[in-house]
Amino acid sequence: MQKRAIYPGTFDPITNGHLDIVTRATQMFDHVILAIAASPGKKPMFTLDERVALAQKATAHLGNVEVVGFSDLMANFARDRQANILIRGLRAVADFEYEMQLAHMNRHLIPQLESVFLIPSKEWSFISSSLVKEVARHQGDVTHFLPDNVHQALMDKLK
């Protein structure tokens, strides 16, 4: 039986920290779905279609990753995709409480849905899409934190 996992998030935009998590997940699971949430309430900088395209290009070298956009409830999306594992990245203790609440709610909705928490590599443990965008808005160099295609797209958005 194939182990299918979902790595959900807004990915606005996808960072090297996200790539670190998804790359490591590909070594643990047969198929990883990078599920990009529409998240209209967060007012993303990039449209859902743009975020999907950026992530597809950034993960093209990973043969067992599928990138899709979604707007459903995560638990229902996982059920529909026949995945029973959710991958979540934990950068700091502050992330844990929220992630634990999500994990419990998802498990309440679908009892067989497991959450697997991965800690990013030290190099990426402090970055977030929001922080990268904020630094870039103030002309800070964020080249190191983003895949090349994403960096170019961010610079184009900020022009």
Curated annotation (Swiss-Prot):
Subcellular location: Cytoplasm
Cofactor(s) named in the record: Mg(2+)
Keywords linked to the UniProt accession: ATP-binding, Coenzyme A biosynthesis, Cytoplasm, Magnesium, Nucleotide-binding, Nucleotidyltransferase, Transferase
CDD domains linked to this entry: PPAT
Domain of life: Bacteria
Catalytic activity from the UniProt record: (R)-4'-phosphopantetheine + ATP + H(+) = 3'-dephospho-CoA + diphosphate
One GO MF term: pantetheine-phosphate adenylyltransferase activity
SUPFAM superfamilies in the cross-refs: Nucleotidylyl transferase (SSF52374)
BP GO terms, sorted: coenzyme A biosynthetic process
Record keyword Transferase present: yes
Annotated positions binding ATP: 10-11, 18, 89-91, 99, 124-130
GO cellular component terms attached to this protein's record: cytoplasm
Documented EC number(s): 2.7.7.3
Sites marked Transition state stabilizer: 18
UniProt-listed PANTHER family: PHOSPHOPANTETHEINE ADENYLYLTRANSFERASE
Family assignment from sequence similarity: Belongs to the bacterial CoaD family.
Entry protein name: Phosphopantetheine adenylyltransferase
Originating organism: Salmonella paratyphi C (strain RKS4594)
UniProt gene name: coaD
